[in-house]
Amino acid sequence: MSGTGALMTVHVGQCGNQLAQAFWKSMVDEHGINERGQTTHEDDMNDKKDLLFYQADDDHYVPRAVLVDLEPRVINGMMQSPNFSNLFNTDNIFMSDHGGGAGNNWASGYCQGQEVQEKIMDIIIREAENTNNLDGILFTHSVSGGTGSGTGSLLLERLREAFPKKVIQTYSVFANSDTSTDVVVHPYNWVLSMQRLIENPDHVVVLDNAALHRLAAGKFKTDTPTFDHINSLVARIMSTSTAPYRFNSAMCPSIRYLDLAPFPPMHFIQSAISPVVDPNENFTRKTSVADVTRFLLKPTSMMVSTASRVRPNDCMLSAYMFLQGQIEAHTIMTAEQNVDFAIRRPPFYMLKPLRMMHAPLSPYVRPQYKVSGLLLNNSTSVAPLFESLLSKYDKLRSKRAFIDKFEKIDNFSLDMMDDAMHIVQDLLDEYKAVVQKDYLTRGL
């Protein structure tokens, strides 16, 4: 695995493209690029702009991004904004001709996607072929609505087929079943999306909307967090998780080195960030490696609501903690030793599941704090979220509630829904089994 290749991003649906706005705003700031794709600073030798950007013939930088939606509002808004109107390659944008969206219906999004999939895949493959060495694809979407879940599911199938050896990492926004949502059929959309998330990506970063709102409300001191608040948190997760590749880390120079899924298909990743700061307020805390590490490892810090319900058998399967800022190497080693005893791993697993490392900061952006961190955590503690959503699905399905919304879609069969439910249940069984001593020998 020598050398470092490039990454491209695919953003699908309203939520996926709203995340694109926040993520790419962070990327241009962190790489010293203005809204016209021009550099604003002298290049730093550790700044690998070409990981996520390419240079056009006039040398301005262009995001290696593909934007997809079945209705035009969000993408049109981006392209009319001063931050993005001259940044993206308009040939990499797909919007449906009819512009009617998918009506928050997975079946509609999936079946409409079948009609336009070749056009979208032509864009993605062309962009990939313009890259000398593609390492992976970052994919943003929601699993609750119609386009992000349905069209997103279809594109994940096609991406895996087209790029069998590339890393596919999704940032998937979930609507927690314990909270209200304006999408009454979201448990159906979720279970159908989950099958494709189980079968296709290498990693799925689970972003629970309820947990994101709770964190934003507490840290930004508002009862009604905005999309900007929520999306800034997700952009921070995406930014920090890619920082080692973007700024020349020797410890983790490529997404191909990220070993987060030793037991596939258990590749669903929780995340936590610290500190969370309102950019409009003065930051008065003193940060340290020990303080940030302690916060990141608290179950209540995870971006998954049910993570606060600690279960005695839950195990960490694999995790990475990226620490940024003014840090001496020995403090990371000390912190790693101090937390190792508190981490529960599967009884058959001898390796340390947590790897802690220093991740470089952008040379062009000065943070408000001296030390910050991100935890990417593959733990069995994510299973209660899936159990909760599957229970909600079972209740709706047993009553055939809102099933007519799916039955009226051409080329959709309810067998697809039932098959997906069984695949999700198999995943939950796997989470229960992996904490047992005989996990590796069962069935032999």
Curated annotation (Swiss-Prot):
Q: Where in the cell is it found?
A: Cytoplasm, Cytoskeleton, Microtubule organizing center, Centrosome; Cell junction, Hemidesmosome; Cell junction, Adherens junction
Does the keyword field hold Membrane?
no
The GO cellular component terms are: adherens junction; centrosome; cytoplasm; gamma-tubulin ring complex; hemidesmosome; microtubule; nucleus; spindle
Q: Which UniProt keywords apply?
A: Cell junction, Cytoplasm, Cytoskeleton, GTP-binding, Microtubule, Nucleotide-binding
Does the UniProt entry include the keyword GTP-binding? yes
From the Swiss-Prot or TrEMBL record, what is one GO molecular function term? microtubule nucleator activity
Q: Which CDD domains match?
A: gamma_tubulin
Q: Where does GTP bind?
A: 144-150
Q: List the Pfam families hit by this protein, alphabetically.
A: Tubulin, Tubulin_C
Q: GO annotations under biological process?
A: cytoplasmic microtubule organization; detection of temperature stimulus; maintenance of centrosome location; meiotic spindle organization; microtubule nucleation; mitotic cell cycle; mitotic sister chromatid segregation; mitotic spindle organization
Q: Name the PANTHER family for this protein.
A: TUBULIN
Could you say which protein family the record assigns here?
Belongs to the tubulin family.
Q: What does this protein do?
A: Tubulin is the major constituent of microtubules. The gamma chain is found at microtubule organizing centers (MTOC) such as the spindle poles or the centrosome, suggesting that it is involved in the minus-end nucleation of microtubule assembly.
UniProt-recorded name of the protein: Tubulin gamma chain
Provenance organism: Caenorhabditis elegans
